[in-house]
Amino acid sequence: MSKVGTSDSKNTLYCSFCGKSQHEVRKLIAGPTVFICDECVELCMDIIREENKSSLVKSRDGIPTPKEICKVLDDYVIGQNHAKKVLSVAVHNHYKRLNHQTKHNDVELAKSNILLIGPTGSGKTLLAQTLARILDVPFTMADATTLTEAGYVGEDVENIILKLLQAADYNVERAQRGIVYIDEIDKISRKSDNPSITRDVSGEGVQQALLKIMEGTVASVPPQGGRKHPQQEFLQVDTTNILFICGGAFAGLEKIISSRGRTTSIGFAAQVLAPEDRRTGEIFRHVEPEDLLKYGLIPEFVGRLPVVATLEDLDENSLKKILTDPKNALVKQYQRLFEMENVELTFADEALGAVARKAIERKTGARGLRSILESILLETMFDLPGLEGVEEVVISREVVDGTARPLYIYADRTDRAAETSASA
């Protein structure tokens, strides 16, 4: 105690814990022989909250169940039920392992990193982002195409840990429980079956560099960038408990899987489809580690990704639901933009189907929906702020097909529609 809570000649009272006078604090609470200020009370409450939080983690997992994780994923990601189940179970088990690793020292539970395989625009990145939002842990994304071996032009794999540390506000303890999503992982496949032909600094070399941080190592991370501040102290980050999720479209992998020919049906009534007649996502469901090895991933790298979740192609109905159902659906976003102009935006059901078919034709999946809507609504969003009296804008199938312009409905004369079905 710095100062006893007694009064001086001016009868000034002091906090018995921090020593501040009654004039320096908002409130001073008196006890039988001591005084405590409001700041010390708040500090004590913070300590108690942290203690309660840690005891809660010890008594319970502190993370949602797989069903709860899957339910939240349903709010943001349409379809992909199998991938959601695989991810929910894998993430739940990973954090359950973290919370109980000090209790069960007799059995060491290995980490299960995740590999997401699916066509472009099927929701791989969105699944990883939503998982990080559910679990409230630091999350970072990295592009595998920018990674090179140390010493070559490009990003080192240690930069991934630096980004995760920045997402955790340089809290090393939080960063060591975070999630790293590495996109375009198929782009670092080995360029040739013969590994000794040439130096592959962005393919097999990156796979070798990623092995260390994915399995678990203590990475030395310069918090402000090593080149600009060479004298700074390095932060030590243990990657053992960081969950790595790798995703990629793996274009051409379906041909390797089909060439195995082990998924064909047998019998007179069996319907055997040629590879070109089967959807890519359906073929991906039968992927085996040997297929990934033939694609160009090295055996050690495949071994670090024991959990494989395959995503399916999005059909027309799924794409229509993506446009309207999620909390952050594209149609809802554009309707909100039009509401700011006091205008209601309406899409006909046939128009949504036409947008979905366009995305399927372009083979861009859900990622291409925004660009399609942007091109459809560009002229309307350009003209609308300068128009008066517009109450509603209606988008029909003909508008999506490019044979008509949006229908403008005015507030003063509801029976009049401007900009009607003029040829584009």
Curated annotation (Swiss-Prot):
InterPro entries noted in UniProt: AAA+_ATPase, ATP-dep_Clp_protease_ClpX, ATPase_AAA_core, Clp_ATPase_C, Clp_protease_ATP-bd_su_ClpX, ClpX_bact, P-loop_NTPase, Znf_CppX_C4
Keyword Ribosomal protein belongs to the record: no
One annotated Gene Ontology cellular component of this protein: HslUV protease complex
Transmembrane segments: none
Gene3D superfamilies: 1.10.8.60, ClpX chaperone, C4-type zinc finger domain (6.20.220.10), P-loop containing nucleotide triphosphate hydrolases (3.40.50.300)
Positions of the ClpX-type ZB domain: 3-56
Secretion signal span: none
Keywords: ATP-binding, Chaperone, Metal-binding, Nucleotide-binding, Zinc
A biological process from GO: cell division
Pfam families in the cross-refs: AAA_2, ClpB_D2-small, zf-C4_ClpX
Binding-site residues, Zn(2+): 15, 18, 37, 40
UniProt-recorded Gene Ontology molecular function terms: ATP binding; ATP hydrolysis activity; ATP-dependent protein folding chaperone; protein dimerization activity; unfolded protein binding; zinc ion binding
Binding-site residues, ATP: 119-126
Function as written in the Swiss-Prot or TrEMBL entry: ATP-dependent specificity component of the Clp protease. It directs the protease to specific substrates. Can perform chaperone functions in the absence of ClpP.
Family per similarity comment: Belongs to the ClpX chaperone family.
UniProt subunit comment: Component of the ClpX-ClpP complex. Forms a hexameric ring that, in the presence of ATP, binds to fourteen ClpP subunits assembled into a disk-like structure with a central cavity, resembling the structure of eukaryotic proteasomes.
Protein name: ATP-dependent Clp protease ATP-binding subunit ClpX
The organism of origin for this protein: Rhodopseudomonas palustris (strain TIE-1)
Gene that produces this protein: clpX
